[in-house]
């Protein structure tokens, strides 16, 4: 199934200004999956400010257009959406050519389905200025080509990627991308933060508790829950007698709750009867100070936690991983700062 291969990543971020608390980043994820015998490849493009998806394009939609995914983007005029739609459609066509070219690089037949991914974005520092940029490309779920931290050179993972690296160097692609990341990306991130500040800049502290799950007569699992928090960055750790405890622990990835907030849990296996020696420590910027939790037998929830677990299992089947990467060639988009994300381009000559 095509949908199963379209992976979305919730972005990390860094601080903006002294007046805007929290972490902030702008990231775009583009994924194309070939469908032999079924027409054009499926192409999906999504944009995130921090942990919030704010735009989306899907060429399988009845009327393929870039559309808002956050209420604060609905105020944008038709000129913005027309421009972003054209750019997304152009990128979809470039991805189609890229898939064919990569298939040739790896000597693959036309019968199989292949996936091309591209991720790029920028982070801001505490002073509101550019802190770092990134761009990654992947083919069939594996790293292909990555722009290094200096934004001046590339890391190619194999001989096929080295072909792309040479072409990129000849076209001064790193220089073009660096200009976009350090300037245009930062400018648009500031604009989006201003437009969505009531949502993006708020803090929602986690609702926390610890549950107890017997494994046998000798062992039990303590699970520390953090629910309904925003932004997504959070730290859950277990300690035994005040010391860090990592043995027999399990930590799930932070997951969206579906209402704009996030969920996470961390579990530890403990000897029965020694539960009170273990404490869960929660750190989140929405909390005035870190929390320390213990299991409380008298207030152990029963039925409610079943619904929570079921919800997390369902979310785990939907949010299956991270998109990293995707197009091989890109040239600086015409119009410069007119676009909020850089346009991918490709030449299949070679």
From Swiss-Prot:
PROSITE patterns: IG_LIKE, IG_MHC
GO MF term (any one): peptide antigen binding
CC annotations in GO: external side of plasma membrane; extracellular space; MHC class I protein complex
Residues covered by region (Alpha-1): 22-111
An annotated GO BP: positive regulation of T cell mediated cytotoxicity
Transmembrane segments: 306-329
Segments on the Cytoplasmic face: 330-350
Domain of life: Eukaryota
Start and end residues of each stretch annotated as Connecting peptide: 296-305
Keyword flag Membrane: yes
InterPro entries per the UniProt record, alphabetical: Ig-like_dom, Ig-like_dom_sf, Ig-like_fold, Ig/MHC_CS, Ig_C1-set, MHC_class-I_related, MHC_I-like_Ag-recog, MHC_I-like_Ag-recog_sf
SMART domains: IGc1 (SM00407)
Main location: membrane
Region named Alpha-2: 112-203
Transmembrane helix found in the keyword field: yes
Ig-like C1-type domain residues: 206-294
Disulfide bonds: 122-185, 224-280
Residue intervals annotated with topology Extracellular: 22-305
Membrane topology: Single-pass type I membrane protein
UniProt keyword list: Disulfide bond, Glycoprotein, Immunity, Membrane, MHC I, Signal, Transmembrane, Transmembrane helix
Family classification: Belongs to the MHC class I family.
Identification of the protein by name: Patr class I histocompatibility antigen, alpha chain E
Annotated gene: Patr-E
């Amino acid at each position: 199934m095509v949908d199963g291969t379209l992976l979305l990543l919730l972005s990390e971020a860094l601080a903006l200004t002294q007046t805007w608390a929290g972490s902030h980043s702008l990231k775009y994820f583009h994924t194309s999956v070939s469908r032999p015998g079924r027409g054009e490849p499926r192409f999906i493009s999504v944009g995130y400010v921090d942990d919030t998806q704010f735009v989306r394009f899907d060429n399988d939609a009845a009327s393929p257009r870039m559309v808002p995914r956050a209420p604060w983007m609905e105020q944008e005029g038709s000129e913005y959406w027309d421009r972003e739609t054209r750019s997304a459609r152009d990128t979809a066509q470039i991805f189609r050519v890229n898939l064919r070219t990569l298939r040739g690089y790896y000597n693959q037949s036309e019968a199989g389905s292949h996936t091309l991914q591209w991720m790029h974005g920028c982070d801001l520092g505490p002073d509101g200025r550019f802190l770092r940029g990134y761009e990654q490309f992947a083919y069939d779920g594996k790293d292909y080509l990555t722009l290094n931290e200096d934004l001046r050179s590339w890391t190619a993972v194999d001989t096929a990627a080295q072909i792309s690296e040479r072409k990129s160097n000849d076209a001064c692609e790193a220089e073009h991308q660096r200009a976009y990341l350090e300037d245009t990306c930062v400018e648009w991130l500031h604009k989006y933060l201003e437009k969505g500040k009531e949502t993006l800049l708020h803090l929602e502290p986690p609702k926390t508790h610890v549950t107890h799950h017997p494994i046998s007569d000798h062992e039990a699992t303590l699970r520390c829950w953090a629910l309904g928090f925003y932004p997504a960055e959070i730290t859950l750790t277990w300690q035994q007698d005040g010391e860090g405890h990592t043995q027999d622990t399990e930590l799930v990835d932070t997951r969206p709750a579906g209402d704009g907030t996030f969920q996470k849990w961390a579990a530890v296996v403990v000897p029965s009867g020694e539960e009170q020696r273990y404490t869960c420590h929660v750190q989140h910027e929405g909390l005035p100070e870190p929390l320390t939790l213990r299991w409380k037998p008298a207030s152990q929830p029963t039925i409610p936690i079943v619904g929570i677990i079921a919800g997390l299992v369902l979310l785990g089947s939907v949010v299956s991983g991270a998109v990293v990467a995707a197009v091989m060639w890109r040239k600086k988009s015409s119009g410069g700062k007119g676009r909020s994300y850089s346009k991918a381009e490709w030449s299949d000559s070679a």
